[in-house]
């Protein structure tokens, strides 16, 4: 992970390369989760008959007229307790209440009731089982309804922590276990564990083709220069070291194609690491809408076939998490069985959703 992503953590942890994905935002601004106080203004006689938006632009010069118009349209500006249109004329003596609305990126700091599946909780840390479809922290296109917003709602004091205590993430459509710090010392400790690569993160993935019995994919990952929305194997200096260890637990034959169930152990935590690594080996994940190439130079193309059950996301689940508890110093671990959608697909493939990990 980039140093910029952890610049708001204590100095001892700023060299961590495994805390947040490379494009993570700094979500530790002070005042996170605080309510916005309304602004009350009275229209002077000199502005009698003026349009509401123009009058407010003169009385509240810190805000642009376009932003004020947006607030009026949103019903956040009231005259005498009633919402009005921007073109409405004001009268001298009118009492105007303006409730400033946060810009999209500011919603990153708003507490919202988001359903979090809590697997474990104490005064030091929290472990959640994130469902597919839930975004971890706000970013373009997903400014609200994230894990971070839910943390601020559940724990108001999390507003004082960098990123509300988040130290690592899962992709939106990846399900499974995440650990979140509840104190700054715990967050610092967890970042150091990630830096030392002692946090054990185990995933289950369904991939196309027959994978080797076991192996390690050691290939650097960086932003794809041909498509900046993708990550890719980058052999130049801009690629960051990435290692994924895997074991094949099961292989099924669909007639025209094969599907492998693999257990993955992350040594590093690059953006989209498992998805990129297995695509690079010619074994893209089932359901992955982005990393879909099914061939590797010098190897035959992996054949794909219709699945026996519909599946609308990448088949990836963070099934096991292990670390040293920041307060007790004891080794602890958690397990989260595969969610219903993945279990149904595995049943249809005649694989055991309760497969034993190795």
From Swiss-Prot:
Keywords: Cytoplasm, Isomerase, RNA-binding, rRNA processing. PROSITE patterns: PSI_RLU, S4. Its EC number is 5.4.99.23. The active site is at 171. GO terms for molecular function: 23S rRNA pseudouridine(1911/1915/1917) synthase activity; RNA binding. Residues 50-114 form the S4 RNA-binding domain. It is found in: Cytoplasm. Disulfide bonds: none annotated. GO terms for biological process: enzyme-directed rRNA pseudouridine synthesis. InterPro entries: PsdUridine_synth_cat_dom_sf (IPR020103), PsdUridine_synth_RluA-like_CS (IPR006224), PsdUridine_synth_RluC/D (IPR006225), PsdUridine_synth_RsuA/RluA (IPR006145), RluA_PseudoU_synthase (IPR050188), S4_RNA-bd (IPR002942), S4_RNA-bd_sf (IPR036986). Pfam families: PseudoU_synth_2, S4. It is an enzyme of class 5 (isomerase). SMART domains: S4. GO terms for cellular component: cytoplasm. It catalyses: uridine(1911/1915/1917) in 23S rRNA = pseudouridine(1911/1915/1917) in 23S rRNA. Responsible for synthesis of pseudouridine from uracil at positions 1911, 1915 and 1917 in 23S ribosomal RNA. Belongs to the pseudouridine synthase RluA family. This is Ribosomal large subunit pseudouridine synthase D. It comes from Ralstonia nicotianae (strain ATCC BAA-1114 / GMI1000). The gene is rluD.
């Amino acid at each position: 992970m980039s140093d910029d992503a952890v610049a708001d953590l204590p100095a001892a942890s700023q060299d961590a390369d495994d805390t947040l994905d490379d494009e993570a935002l700094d979500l530790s601004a002070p005042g996170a989760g605080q309510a916005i106080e309304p602004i009350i203004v009275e229209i002077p006689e000199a502005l009698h008959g003026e349009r509401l938006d123009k009058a407010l632009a003169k009385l509240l010069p810190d805000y642009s007229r376009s932003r004020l118009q947006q607030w009026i349209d949103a019903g956040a500006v009231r005259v005498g307790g009633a919402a009005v249109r921007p073109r409405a004329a004001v009268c001298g003596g009118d009492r105007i209440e303006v409730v400033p609305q946060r810009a999209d990126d500011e919603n990153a700091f708003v507490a919202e009731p988001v359903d979090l599946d809590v697997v474990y909780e104490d005064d030091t840390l929290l472990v959640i089982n994130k469902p597919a479809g839930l975004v971890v922290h706000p970013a373009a296109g997903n400014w609200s309804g994230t894990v971070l917003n839910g943390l601020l709602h559940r724990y108001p004091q999390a507003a004082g922590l960098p990123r509300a205590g988040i130290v690592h993430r899962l992709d939106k459509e990846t399900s499974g276990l995440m650990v979140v710090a509840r104190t700054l010392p715990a967050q610092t400790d967890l970042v150091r564990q990630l830096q030392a690569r002692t946090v054990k993160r185990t995933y289950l993935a369904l991939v196309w083709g027959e994978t080797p019995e076991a192996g390690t994919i050691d290939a650097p990952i960086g932003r794809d220069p041909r498509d900046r929305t993708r990550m890719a194997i980058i052999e130049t200096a801009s690629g960051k070291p990435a290692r994924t260890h895997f074991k094949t637990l099961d292989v099924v034959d669909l007639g025209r194609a094969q599907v492998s169930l693999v257990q993955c152990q992350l040594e590093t935590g690059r953006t989209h690491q498992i998805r990129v690594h297995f695509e690079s080996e010619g074994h893209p994940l089932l359901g992955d809408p982005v990393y879909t190439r099914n061939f590797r130079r010098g190897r035959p193309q992996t054949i794909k076939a219709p699945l026996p059950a519909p599946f609308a996301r990448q088949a990836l689940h963070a099934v096991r998490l292990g670390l040293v508890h920041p307060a007790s110093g004891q080794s602890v671990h958690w397990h989260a069985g595969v969610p219903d959608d993945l279990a149904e697909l595995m049943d249809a493939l005649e694989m055991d959703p309760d497969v034993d990990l190795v």
